[in-house]
Amino acid sequence: MGLICHLDFDIGISNNMGSRHLSRSIAMQSLYEKDFMGDKVDLEEVLERNIREFGPGLEDTDFARKLALGVAENMDKIDKIIEKAAPEWPIEQINIVDRNVLRIGLYELIYSNKEEVPPKVAINEAIELAKMFGGESSGKFINGVLGTVFKQISN
């Protein structure tokens, strides 16, 4: 899983979009590990290790921190939104990758500056993370849930 991020960095992340994509990948990996390990690990320590390991030279490390820590701070609210948007999927039954990609996507959709991260960018980036780290149907699932939430908050 980490190798993909490391390869992304090695091929050269020269623009803000690529840097943000790498930051999202690092945030997702950190949230995944915290979700998997629970109280055995500290999210901030995991995040700092992942930034060092997968993002050496990454200019905007604050974006990865903002995402991971923002998701953690708002996780209960975000999880309730997921449960409303996908009632047939209790949060604990959603694949751990998909669950954390949804959390990042919803955090960006709901809590981020819309000028900095337009909703369509937040949704597309979440779909890309799902395709990179998730299963065969992850992209469609993420798209469906985030699309549902986007329609609800747009009305």
Each predicted region: which residue ranges?
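N-terminal interaction/assembly modules
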Residues: 2-139, 144-155
